[in-house]
């Protein structure tokens, strides 16, 4: 690649299932590298498997990238010079490339059945599970005609080179597969439909992809891709072989790869809990890369400025939910309070949680919990006491704080608040401190815990005086009186 050529990377998932955090990590690294280099981020859908692919999963991929803010320069709903960007719409392109590969002798029709291949291995004293033996390379025209007359439907296989296949992996360094270690591989099904082994490198060539950043699990397929790229160059379809970078595996518990069965692998499960994009992307960036040894908290702009694929670590990265949560909490605290309020309202609305406060009061309540939550979903437990239909005194909290000692506290609090001239947090605080700390000589925890339980139903809530102000005089007094009845007469 010359200095004048632009980096072109691609993210090309198959639309199956729910977006996996490992998949999103791959998208993030590709996106960040494109933005860092001033290059192009191509989003391509590999939907050639009609039995597994679904429109629902396709739409989920679009939703995931949009929620995360990973915008694409070319791809679905955006277009671009090398479209279409869904492989299911590129069948004619693949048929043309196949015809050219066959005409040039780079590929051939293979008629052998798996049983025939295995039988030949056994007859030759080889391991029967070695895979295809390149037998059909040397068929005569008469043999091919005979197979066709039998009604056999051939697959198309690429003729692998007789040389070593090697590349300098941008993450792992030099990698070599010895000549003969990779057999001729199928480019099509017997039906003639193209396989991933054809369409993926073919699209990379036609879309002029310069760098392929993908998961380590795909490294064994790289020799086949190199060989096909070489053939595509020889027939005039490709201009270059892209540079490869194989990103480290994301692990779950122990040493096992994070699988779709692991709850933390589901991107939308994190969103449903209340992760914000900034927090999740920050954590995913750390799965194989770091901005600095002592600097784990950063935003996308910082990542883009610093990211180079050459700095990606080759060692597996373990998904640590606690660390992800901690980073998300930090990013929530960093949000402008107005921005946080909007996001919190949207999250609660999405999950059917309505807080019985007007807009101004909700904004004030949001500010109270912003530094007290890890994910947006935590706010519901802290704020639901504002809803009369959700308010209930927790029995454990009542047993702890609304015992005999609580009666005197509630009596004094009710007396002090009844005579309060204004219902604001500073005046509420002053009245209660005067009555309970000065008047009853109580320590703050003993003074205010019974009031907290009475007003909110729990021992954990937003700041007490501000909560009472937002709850309002009437509802606050009603709840304190009801709690006093629970305590009984002192």
From Swiss-Prot:
GO terms for biological process: glutamyl-tRNA aminoacylation. Its EC number is 6.1.1.17. A motif ('KMSKS' region) lies at residues 257-261. ATP binds at residue 260. It is found in: Cytoplasm. GO terms for cellular component: cytosol. The keyword Nucleotide-binding applies. It holds the Pfam family Anticodon_2. Monomer. The keyword Protein biosynthesis applies. Keywords: Aminoacyl-tRNA synthetase, ATP-binding, Cytoplasm, Ligase, Nucleotide-binding, Protein biosynthesis. Belongs to the class-I aminoacyl-tRNA synthetase family. Glutamate--tRNA ligase type 1 subfamily. It is an enzyme of class 6 (ligase). GO terms for molecular function: ATP binding; glutamate-tRNA ligase activity; tRNA binding; zinc ion binding. Gene3D superfamilies: 1.10.10.350, Glutamate-tRNA synthetase, class I, anticodon-binding domain 1, Glutamyl-trna Synthetase, Domain 2, Glutamyl-tRNA Synthetase, Domain 3, HUPs. It comes from Mycobacterium bovis (strain BCG / Pasteur 1173P2). Its main location: cytoplasm. Catalyzes the attachment of glutamate to tRNA(Glu) in a two-step reaction: glutamate is first activated by ATP to form Glu-AMP and then transferred to the acceptor end of tRNA(Glu). PANTHER family: GLUTAMATE--TRNA LIGASE (PTHR43311), GLUTAMATE--TRNA LIGASE, MITOCHONDRIAL-RELATED (PTHR43311:SF2). A motif ('HIGH' region) lies at residues 13-23. It catalyses: tRNA(Glu) + L-glutamate + ATP = L-glutamyl-tRNA(Glu) + AMP + diphosphate. This is Glutamate--tRNA ligase.
């Amino acid at each position: 690649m010359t200095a004048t050529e632009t980096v072109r990377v691609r993210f090309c998932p198959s639309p199956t299932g729910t977006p996996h955090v490992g998949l999103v990590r791959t998208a993030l690294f590709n996106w960040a590298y494109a933005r860092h280099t001033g290059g192009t981020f191509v989003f391509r859908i590999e939907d050639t498997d009609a039995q597994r692919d679904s429109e629902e999963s396709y739409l989920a991929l679009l939703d995931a990238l949009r929620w995360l803010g990973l915008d694409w320069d070319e791809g679905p709903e955006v277009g671009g010079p090398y479209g279409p960007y869904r492989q299911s719409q590129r069948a004619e392109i693949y048929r043309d490339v196949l015809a050219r590969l066959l005409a040039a002798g780079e590929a051939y029709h293979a008629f052998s059945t798996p049983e025939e291949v295995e039988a030949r291995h056994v007859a030759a004293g080889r391991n029967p599970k070695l895979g295809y033996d390149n037998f059909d390379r040397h068929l005569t025209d008469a043999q091919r005609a005979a197979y066709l007359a039998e009604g056999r439907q051939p697959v198309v296989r690429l003729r692998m080179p007789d040389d070593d296949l090697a590349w300098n992996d941008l993450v792992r360094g030099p990698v070599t597969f010895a000549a003969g270690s990779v057999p001729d591989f199928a480019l099509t099904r017997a039906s003639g439909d193209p396989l991933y082994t054809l369409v993926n490198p073919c699209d990379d060539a036609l879309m002029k992809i310069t760098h392929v950043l993908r998961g380590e699990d795909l490294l064994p397929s790289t020799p086949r891709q190199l060989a096909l790229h070489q053939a595509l160059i020889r027939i005039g379809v490709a201009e270059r072989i892209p540079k490869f970078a194989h990103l480290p595996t994301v692990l779950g518990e122990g040493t096992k790869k994070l699988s779709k069965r692991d709850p933390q692998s589901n991107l939308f499960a994190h969103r449903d809990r209340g992760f914000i994009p900034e927090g999740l992307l920050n954590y995913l960036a750390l799965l194989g890369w770091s901005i600095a040894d002592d600097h784990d908290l950063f935003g996308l702009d910082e990542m883009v400025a610093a990211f180079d694929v050459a700095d990606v670590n080759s060692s597996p990265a373990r998904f640590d939910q606690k660390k992800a949560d901690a980073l998300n909490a930090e990013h929530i605290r960093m949000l402008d309070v107005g921005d946080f309020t909007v996001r919190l309202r949207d999250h609660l609305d999405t999950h059917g949680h309505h807080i019985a406060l007007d807009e101004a009061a909700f904004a004030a309540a949001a500010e109270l919990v912003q530094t007290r939550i890890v994910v947006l979903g935590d706010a519901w437990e802290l704020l639901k006491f504002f809803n009369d239909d959700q308010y209930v005194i927790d029995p454990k909290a009542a047993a702890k704080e609304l015992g005999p000692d609580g009666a005197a506290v509630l009596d004094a609090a009710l007396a002090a608040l009844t005579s309060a001239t204004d219902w604001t947090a500073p005046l509420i605080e002053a009245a209660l401190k005067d009555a309970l700390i000065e008047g009853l000589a109580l320590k703050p925890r003993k003074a205010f815990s019974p009031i907290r339980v009475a007003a909110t139903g729990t021992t954990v809530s937003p700041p007490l005086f501000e909560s009472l102000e937002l709850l309002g005089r009437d509802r606050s007094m009603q709840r304190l009186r009801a709690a006093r009845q629970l305590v009984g007469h002192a």
